[in-house]
Amino acid sequence: MSGGGTETPVACDAAQGGKKRDSLGTPGAAHLIIKDLGEIHSRLLDHRPVTQGEIRYFVKEFEEKRGLRELRVLKNLENTIQETNECLLPKCRETMECGLGETLQRLQAANDSICRLQQREQERKKVINDYLTASEKRRLVQWEEFVSGQPQRRAEVDEEHRRAVERLREQYAAMEKDLAKFSTF
């Protein structure tokens, strides 16, 4: 690999038919060497195409497997929904209609009895309130009569007291006279 001029033919070149090879020093040969080195480098050291191919293969396989798995999940969901719509939903609806009618009847009966109880309670409260109001009015009338009759009663009691005092005076006066008769003995 000298950078010099021409090469002398080697014995093996002459033996091959006398065809002369390009020398390593010519510009075309350097270009071929660089091209060969680039191919060797890309094959040995540049793994981008291989990596990209592997990535594409992995993504394709992943999407296929994932797609199948999701398809199975969706199919199972569809079967479950169809089974629910065909079997469970009519049974639930029928059970609900049977039980709901009976429940509504019970609820209506309970509601009616509660309304009756509430009405009785309101009537009882009204009777009690009316009685209390009437009693209060009677007591007020009685109180008014009592208060208005007090001066007359007081006058009667005072008169009675005056008479009793007068009688007691007369009695004590009579007793003093009797005592005076006995004390002179």
Curated annotation (Swiss-Prot):
Domain of life of the native organism: Eukaryota
Tissues of expression: Detected in heart, brain, spleen, lung, kidney and testis.
Record keyword Acetylation present: yes
Pfam family, any one: Muted
Illness association: Defects in Muted are the cause of the Muted (mu) mutant, which is characterized by light eyes at birth, hypopigmentation of the coat, platelet storage pool deficiency and lysosomal hyposecretion.
Primary role: Component of the BLOC-1 complex, a complex that is required for normal biogenesis of lysosome-related organelles (LRO), such as platelet dense granules and melanosomes. In concert with the AP-3 complex, the BLOC-1 complex is required to target membrane protein cargos into vesicles assembled at cell bodies for delivery into neurites and nerve terminals. The BLOC-1 complex, in association with SNARE proteins, is also proposed to be involved in neurite extension. Plays a role in intracellular vesicle trafficking.
Subunit-structure text: Octamer composed of one copy each BLOC1S1, BLOC1S2, BLOC1S3, BLOC1S4, BLOC1S5, BLOC1S6, DTNBP1/BLOC1S7 and SNAPIN/BLOC1S8. Component of the biogenesis of lysosome-related organelles complex 1 (BLOC-1) composed of BLOC1S1, BLOC1S2, BLOC1S3, BLOC1S4, BLOC1S5, BLOC1S6, DTNBP1/BLOC1S7 and SNAPIN/BLOC1S8. The BLOC-1 complex associates with the AP-3 protein complex and membrane protein cargos. Interacts with BLOC1S4, BLOC1S6, DTNBP1/BLOC1S7 and PI4K2A.
The name this protein goes by in its record: Biogenesis of lysosome-related organelles complex 1 subunit 5
Organism from which the protein derives: Mus musculus (Mouse)
Gene name for this UniProt entry: Bloc1s5
